[in-house]
């Protein structure tokens, strides 16, 4: 995630893969006594950032920070693929025909993954980690390269959401599959934070983790939370579009920061589980606006995998607000649907 401080009217620039950035002027307060508090720190190998409006009935930043960091610690303990003692990595280490008791939040994410896998015809899949490792993009990767046919066929036997099942409070598998929640974990963390804020009486906030975010309410001066969608460029950060967000999660997935080239072909980290290989279409990035940050997170990945035609049709069918950036020879072109435009203008109907 790229992070920079702007010197000027807007103070904070945050992005994931350089695709999604947040712009929010940090104010000390207004005459009504409300103040805009902000803090952040490391999480999930990246960064999180919180801004919220504090008034007489809401807790101070020290208490709120403790709540947020407890949530992030829970997410890390449950979902991280970079620590061997996490719930999901202990499950991943089990052989075929094994089961493990899982916390309810983990089982709920498995259900979400099953839903997205089914609706995408198997293109989206939470069990692609062995493929990511094989191609050089995963947590146990050694080298970025196109794998051999035999190696790919062998690994694909351990990929597929159909190998998973939930049995009461247990997650079970009939093959040595490995689950990777990276496509929805950060969005899930943001939703957990948003739910906790609601319980604490915090109704105006912008919560962001590794670039996934949700915003609600208004800043103390009455202005909206503003989110900038960055043009997909490797060399610098340039805002493609600035939108206002209230009550929605926003997520961008792009294919242009993590990739390698071999024999004249460009391979990105966006994997189609149906083929076992990276996608090769011209869709560079997808931004999704959704009431749930977790669903925005997962759907932006799903639509990027499906590509410019199938992804667009999926978004229209399911009334999902989307903003596409596509490659057109040596330039980029953008496309957004009516749902995206309506929501980004602050209209819900």
Question: PLM ranges: what are they?
Answer:
Residues 2-8, 13-15, 23, 28-349:
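Mature catalytic core of soluble alpha/beta enzymes
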